[in-house]
Amino acid sequence: MFFFLVFSACEVFVGFSLCTLVISVPFFFLQMTPFYSILCFLSFFALLLHLPCSIYSHTLHFFHHFTIACYHYSLCLSLVALLLFYTLYPFQSITLPLMPFLEKTESSILTISHVYSPPTIITFDGFKRLLRMHVPFYTLSFDTFSTHTNFFPRHTFPIFIARVSLHFVKQLSLSI
């Protein structure tokens, strides 16, 4: 029972961190679409239900597995929606009120390699300049007009995400 509670607590902590990261970036820095807002709400709602059900799973076995499924599916949908949001949303209608230094870069093609999938090409207006100015602690390797870019080593991806998230939260707190 003790190990189950520890595992549930770790799962909730990791899930909450992922949901916070997925929701905070487009909410504070981009225009959020209604569809994406609904997915974010479902992620947080399922996450809030997941914590008590993990603790009392011996009496709420079915409800526990139901909320876990809802939480995982909503989180996956949110991640997919985030990817589509960054790749398919028109560049002209993106507003970044906290980052006015972004400039038009027509050839900023970024390739992110995933462990279990082929490289995914993501185009974003000013993405190179954004990361170079906001992530000084990480050396980025860009190759414009290339179909494959070594953006970051796979084993440093969680550290990279954590540092970028903390930096954005710090900048946001200073601007409020």
Swiss-Prot record:
* Source taxon at top rank: Eukaryota
Keyword field contains Transmembrane = yes
Where found, per UniProt? Answer: Membrane
Chain ranges passing through the membrane: 3-23, 27-47, 79-99, 107-127
Q: Which organism is it from?
A: Schizosaccharomyces pombe (strain 972 / ATCC 24843) (Fission yeast)
Membrane-protein topology: Multi-pass membrane protein
> Mind listing the UniProt keywords for this protein, alphabetically?
Membrane, Transmembrane, Transmembrane helix
The identity of this protein, by name, is: Uncharacterized protein C56F8.15
GO CC entries: endoplasmic reticulum; membrane
